Amino acid sequence: MKTGLKRVKLHVKKNDMVVVLSGNDRGKSGKVLRVYPVKNRVIIEGVNIRKRHMRPTQSNPQGSIIEREFPIHASNVKKS
């Protein structure tokens, strides 16, 4: 673990339904998929979707671009 980072107890847990309070996805709601207490961030289903470029591998020789959820700060969400 990096120095200077402290685990914080968050107000949301996995599988909670939350609403986004600020940012580009403001007003959207979804289920919490994952919680990162050390970074104070959460991943919410269907919120903060970004494109990720995947390298070519033996199973996928062409590579691909997939869309997935990225974490947002826990202070930007509230339970619904």
From Swiss-Prot:
Residues 53-80 are annotated as: Disordered. InterPro entries: KOW (IPR005824), Rib_uL2_dom2 (IPR014722), Ribosomal_uL24 (IPR003256), Ribosomal_uL24_CS (IPR005825), Ribosomal_uL24_KOW (IPR041988), Translation_prot_SH3-like_sf (IPR008991). GO terms for molecular function: rRNA binding; structural constituent of ribosome. SMART domains: KOW. Keywords: Ribonucleoprotein, Ribosomal protein, RNA-binding, rRNA-binding. Disulfide bonds: none annotated. GO terms for biological process: translation. Signal peptide: none annotated. PROSITE patterns: RIBOSOMAL_L24. SUPFAM superfamilies: Translation proteins SH3-like domain. GO terms for cellular component: ribonucleoprotein complex; ribosome. Part of the 50S ribosomal subunit. NCBIfam families: rplX_bact (TIGR01079). One of two assembly initiator proteins, it binds directly to the 5'-end of the 23S rRNA, where it nucleates assembly of the 50S subunit. Belongs to the universal ribosomal protein uL24 family. This is Large ribosomal subunit protein uL24. It comes from Chlorobium luteolum (strain DSM 273 / BCRC 81028 / 2530) (Pelodictyon luteolum).
